[in-house]
Amino acid sequence: MPIASPEIYNEMLDRAKKGAFAYPAINVSSSQTLIAALRGFEEAGSDGIIQFSWGGAEYASGSTIKNAVDGAVALAEFAHVVAKNYKVKIGRAHV
């Protein structure tokens, strides 16, 4: 499924609050950790949340560049492309 829109993400959070449960939130710092998180969500049959920390985003831009904005944009673009291949809803959080 594609990355959840803000409306779908709010529905996910409302469902969790109503059902007294939490979605797993995985900190992503590379395409490999993103794929691992998506696979884990799908294997568990659980929707989930991916989040990019400042340090993770810096790392994703390149170890000598350390541009958190570019790294976060790159990870987000990649997430949008690959998430549609998984059968779970993915919310995104900004840390």
Regions found by a protein language model. Give the residues of each.
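Acidic (Asp/Glu)-rich catalytic clusters
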Residues: 14-15, 38-45, 73-89
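A common structural microfeature
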Residues: 23, 34-37, 45-49
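N-terminal amphipathic alpha-helix/helix-capping segment at the start of soluble metabolic enzymes
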Residues: 1-24
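A generic hydrophobic-helix recognition signal that picks specific residues
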Residues: 20, 89-90
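Glycine-rich, proline-tolerant flexible connector loops at the mouths of alpha/beta enzymes
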Residues: 25, 30, 48-70
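Short, glycine/acidic-enriched capping/hinge loops at junctions between secondary-structure elements
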Residues: 35-39, 60-63
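Conserved active-site and cofactor/substrate-binding residues in soluble primary-metabolism enzymes
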Residues: 3-8, 28-32, 70-74
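Conserved small/polar residues in nucleotide/adenosyl-binding loops
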Residues: 93-95
